[in-house]
């Protein structure tokens, strides 16, 4: 017993019996007393209760298993005696003595003082992966020195290239990772112009003297002593990473788990595993990738130090690790993330080498997945979309690929344009419109299904179980349906007659010119050619505005808005050209670009016109206060009576311009002379406008009271460039801007669905309304453009017009109330 692990324990202990260690199942009952037996009568048994398989030849003396924390007893050469205490133990390979008698080695009623430690060792993996433990470990990393790369959440360690690309969501996102192709170097991954880009951080050693040198990091020109310093410079100064790409980084993509978890998941893997999916951070119960023990792999694993025990248990790769206790692993509810192939083990295996004495493996619920060829080539298996707990385990190609694969091409895949016959077959495919295709279509045969590049067709393919072409060379063993088996009817010839009652889909027209034509506008108030801000025209417009009731003004605004947004007075021909029944649907579609530009043009022009109405009052302070009072009353009517949130937002935008808000004397006069109006503006209109622009319109406005919804957040988001740093709205500078943007997009979907409701509300509100010709002309966009910029300036570029008029408004504001002059001290 000198070689035993417990030979030094005192023999007078009531639990000191030279039996093999018991498993946790032995705690269920303890009925019969324990009887001492000879230690050499039993074979070594793992502490997890799994009996070893018998190999050919004499049983070898093995060292402790990787999953055994205490050890096993040595073999004995003496004959084994049957123990009456050991019953109902299932053996995988029962050993035979010289007489062919089978023996068992476990006692169900056996107790051992190391049992609690065994139980702890089984649950140690679960305890190490709790969210609290991971959060604490992440906080410890982030509390390191700022010059330590691990203290920055944008550093993700050794993650594959494709995983880093999947983490990029918008332009400006970035992270830093270790280079898998050249260990020791770092790569900055970012997104710019909707394309992920990778920049290797150059690492140079500067030798200051024979005994001292330092490492510096750089992209192109300037070098830095540390990577955090480099990132701070490029983020803070908005400096392009390279002059050729022009990529700018400003939004870090932070990790949500400690680097240890990323190392365990991706550290030992090859870049090929990057195609398996994006990083599932924040899920500590995610599955470990495991595989079965094959042959003599156990001997190689024993050479690892004990300090790497967790890595041994959680080893991933096609070079498999050891699974001693499958039932314990199934208790952890491990989920398998499947890859391209799905290879069950337990059927016919590839013959092993004669030197490795293995017996046929019984049917097992364990599966192996990886990117190796299938073990059974005759069977074609389909990829499953989900995996039940404990059903599948996967491997990787960590040691099968000595060098990294070629990097994916950044150029977009060239595909054939979609066939116009698709538009003739379905009304749902007008989202990707090309006006040149209909004219060039000559009745040729339709393109293969895989060449269609429509999002609607992709969804249809997924619903039917088929997939199109992929942007990779990987074979997924999926039998795609042959396109030739699909029935297709050719479009009718030009000479064929179609019944009048038969509905035919007419391809929408892609508008390329604005509906506002200032020079072609026939006006009763403006001459054929006029200069910007003519005094006579300003006085006439102000006279009409001052002498009219606020409700009448609001009705005229609503009438013009409904025509511009194509809510009312939409002809049948216009509906066919749009492809939809309302402009509220058109602005949500890709080819509604021109209508969105027109809506933005009218909104900005209206806001500037209101600001000119206030700042153009060169008379007394009381006149400006009266004009301000009338404008606020019109805003109240638009909000409560008309339900025109579009014009309401234009008035609120004008009142919140810096050139208007700085007029302290004017606002003070408003509070003194029109106290109720000032209170109404501060307590109701401003909070209501804020709620609208935060996407909470449905919580404060009844749907049956809205005739024109809030349009500007949606059209601004859809028409803005990929990245802008100036001209953002107030809600975009909020901490919850992402959630607010999602609310606006969800509201746009509801707005398109309820287009008929808005139309009926507008018709009900404007029932019996008789517009005044002159006032209707004043509130038309063409008139306002001619009045503000003149007949020639109205044709200038929109951005240039707005910039120049912003300077004019600033000059008018300073003329009315000059800024205080700072006295110089001598």
From Swiss-Prot:
Region spans: Mediates the interaction with BCAR1/p130CAS: 745-749
Domain Ras-GEF residue range list: 549-819
Ligase listed as a keyword: no
Post-translational modification remark: Phosphorylated on tyrosine residues.
Pfam families registered for this protein in UniProt: RasGEF, SH2
Biased composition (Polar residues): 350-361
Keyword Acetylation: yes
GO biological-process terms attached to the record: endothelin receptor signaling pathway; epidermal growth factor receptor signaling pathway; insulin receptor signaling pathway; positive regulation of cell population proliferation; positive regulation of GTPase activity; positive regulation of MAPK cascade; small GTPase-mediated signal transduction
GO cellular component: cytoplasm; focal adhesion; membrane
Modified residues (Phosphoserine): 32, 78, 83, 182, 291, 359, 364, 376, 472
Positions where N-acetylalanine occurs in the chain: 2
InterPro entries attached to this UniProt entry: Ras_GEF_dom_sf (IPR023578), RASGEF_cat_dom (IPR001895), RASGEF_cat_dom_sf (IPR036964), SH2 (IPR000980), SH2-Ras-GEF_adapter (IPR051853), SH2_dom_sf (IPR036860), SH2_SHEP1/BCAR3/NSP1 (IPR044102)
Subcellular location: Cytoplasm; Cell junction, Focal adhesion
Region (Disordered): 46-81, 268-287, 294-321, 348-406, 480-501
Entry GO MF terms: guanyl-nucleotide exchange factor activity; phosphotyrosine residue binding
Modification sites for N6-methyllysine: 335
Top-level taxonomic group: Eukaryota
Key words, A-Z: Acetylation, Cell junction, Cytoplasm, Guanine-nucleotide releasing factor, Methylation, Phosphoprotein, SH2 domain
Site (Required for interaction with NEDD9): 749
Domain SH2, chain residue ranges per copy: 154-253
Main location: cytoplasm
Domain notes: The SH2 domain mediates interaction with tyrosine-phosphorylated proteins. However, not involved in the binding to phosphorylated BCAR1. Required for cell cycle progression in response to INS/insulin. Required for regulation of EGF-induced DNA synthesis.
Cited function: Acts as an adapter protein downstream of several growth factor receptors to promote cell proliferation, migration, and redistribution of actin fibers. Specifically involved in INS/insulin signaling pathway by mediating MAPK1/ERK2-MAPK3/ERK1 activation and DNA synthesis. Promotes insulin-mediated membrane ruffling. In response to vasoconstrictor peptide EDN1, involved in the activation of RAP1 downstream of PTK2B via interaction with phosphorylated BCAR1.
PANTHER family tied to this protein: BREAST CANCER ANTI-ESTROGEN RESISTANCE PROTEIN 3, BREAST CANCER ANTI-ESTROGEN RESISTANCE PROTEIN 3 HOMOLOG-LIKE PROTEIN
Assembly and binders: Part of a complex comprised of PTPRA, BCAR1, BCAR3 (via SH2 domain) and SRC; the formation of the complex is dependent on integrin mediated-tyrosine phosphorylation of PTPRA. Within the complex, interacts (via SH2 domain) with PTPRA (when phosphorylated on 'Tyr-797'). Interacts (via Ras-GEF domain) with BCAR1. Interacts (via Ras-GEF domain) with NEDD9. Interacts with PTK2/FAK1. Interacts with PTPN1. Interacts (via SH2 domain) with EGFR (when tyrosine-phosphorylated).
Name of the molecule in the record: Breast cancer anti-estrogen resistance protein 3 homolog
Source species taxonomy: Eukaryota, Metazoa, Chordata, Craniata, Vertebrata
């Amino acid at each position: 017993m000198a070689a035993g692990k417990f030979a030094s324990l005192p023999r007078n202990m009531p639990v000191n019996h030279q039996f093999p260690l018991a498993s946790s199942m032995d705690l269920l009952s303890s009925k019969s007393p324990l009887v001492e037996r000879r230690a050499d009568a039993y074979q070594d048994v793992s502490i997890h209760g799994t009996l070893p398989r018998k190999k050919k030849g004499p049983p070898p003396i093995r060292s402790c298993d990787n999953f055994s924390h205490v050890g096993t007893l040595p073999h004995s050469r003496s004959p084994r005696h049957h123990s009456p205490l050991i019953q109902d133990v299932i053996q995988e390979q029962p050993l035979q003595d010289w007489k062919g008698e089978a023996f068992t080695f476990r006692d169900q009623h056996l107790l051992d003082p190391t049992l609690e430690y065994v139980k702890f060792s089984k649950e140690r993996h679960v305890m190490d992966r709790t969210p609290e433990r991971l959060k604490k470990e992440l906080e410890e990393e982030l509390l390191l020195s700022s010059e330590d790369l691990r203290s920055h959440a944008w550093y993700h360690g050794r993650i594959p290239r494709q995983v880093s690309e999947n983490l990029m969501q918008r332009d400006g996102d970035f992270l830093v990772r270790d280079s898998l192709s050249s260990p020791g170097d770092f790569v900055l991954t970012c997104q710019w112009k909707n394309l992920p880009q990778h920049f290797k951080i150059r690492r140079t050693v500067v030798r200051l003297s024979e005994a001292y040198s330092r490492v510096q990091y750089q992209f192109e020109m300037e070098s830095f002593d540390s990577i955090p310093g480099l990132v701070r410079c490029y983020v803070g100064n908005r400096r392009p990473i390279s002059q050729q790409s022009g990529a700018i980084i400003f939004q870090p993509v932070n990790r949500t788990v400690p680097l240890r978890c990323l190392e365990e998941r991706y550290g030992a893997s090859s870049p090929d595993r990057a195609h398996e999916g994006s990083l599932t951070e924040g899920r500590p119960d995610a599955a470990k990738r495991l595989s079965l023990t094959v042959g003599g792999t156990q001997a190689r694993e024993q050479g690892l130090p004990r300090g790497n025990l967790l890595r041994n248990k959680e080893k991933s790769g096609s070079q498999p690790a050891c699974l001693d206790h499958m039932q314990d692993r199934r208790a952890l509810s491990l989920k398998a993330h499947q890859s391209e192939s799905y290879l069950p083990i337990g059927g016919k295996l590839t013959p092993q080498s004669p030197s490795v004495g293995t017996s046929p493996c019984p049917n097992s619920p364990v599966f192996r997945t990886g990117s190796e060829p299938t073990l059974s080539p005759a069977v074609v298996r389909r990829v499953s979309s989900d995996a039940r707990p404990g059903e599948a385990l996967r491997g990787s190609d960590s040691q099968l690929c000595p060098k990294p694969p070629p990097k994916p091409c950044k150029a977009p895949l060239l595909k054939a344009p979609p066939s116009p016959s698709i538009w003739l077959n379905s009304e749902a495919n007008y989202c990707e419109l090309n006006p040149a295709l209909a004219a060039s279509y000559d009745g040729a045969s339709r393109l293969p299904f895989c060449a269609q590049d429509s999002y609607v067709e992709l969804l249809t393919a997924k619903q039917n179980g088929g997939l199109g072409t992929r942007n990779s060379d990987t074979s997924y063993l999926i039998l795609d349906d042959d396109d030739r088996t699909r029935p297709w009817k050719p479009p009718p010839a030009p000479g064929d007659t179609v019944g009048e009652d038969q509905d035919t889909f007419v391809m929408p027209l892609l508008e390329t010119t604005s509906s506002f034509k200032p020079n072609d506008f026939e006006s009763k108030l403006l001459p054929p050619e006029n200069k910007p801000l003519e005094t006579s025209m300003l006085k006439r417009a102000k006279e009409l505005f001052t002498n009219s009731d606020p409700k009448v003004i609001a009705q005229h605004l609503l009438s013009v808005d409904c025509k511009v947004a194509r809510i009312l007075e939409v002809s049948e021909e216009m509906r066919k050209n749009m492809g939809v029944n309302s402009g509220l649907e058109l602005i949500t579609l890709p080819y509604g670009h021109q209508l969105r530009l027109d809506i933005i043009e009218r909104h900005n022009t209206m806001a500037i016109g209101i600001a000119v109405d206030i700042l153009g009052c060169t008379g007394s302070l009381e006149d400006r206060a009266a004009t301000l009072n009338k404008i606020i009353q019109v805003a109240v009517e638009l909000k409560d009576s008309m339900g025109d949130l579009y014009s309401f937002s234009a008035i609120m935008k004008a009142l919140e311009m810096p050139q208007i808000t700085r007029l302290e004397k004017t606002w003070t006069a408003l509070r003194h002379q029109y106290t109720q109006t000032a209170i109404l503006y501060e307590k109701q209109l401003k909070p209501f406008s804020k709620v609208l622009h935060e996407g909470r319109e449905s919580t404060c406005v009844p749907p049956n009271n809205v005739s024109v919804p809030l349009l500007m957040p949606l059209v601004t988001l859809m028409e803005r460039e990929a990245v802008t740093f100036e001209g953002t709205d107030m809600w975009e500078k909020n901490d919850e801007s992402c959630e607010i943007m999602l609310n606006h997009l969800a509201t746009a979907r509801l707005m398109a669905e309820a287009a008929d409701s808005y139309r009926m509300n507008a018709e009900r509100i404007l029932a019996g309304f008789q517009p005044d010709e002159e006032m209707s002309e004043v509130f038309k966009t063409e008139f306002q453009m001619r009045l503000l910029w003149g007949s020639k300036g109205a044709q200038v570029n929109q951005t240039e017009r707005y910039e120049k008029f912003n300077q004019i408004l600033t000059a008018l504001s300073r003329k009315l109330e000059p800024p205080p002059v700072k006295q110089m001290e001598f």
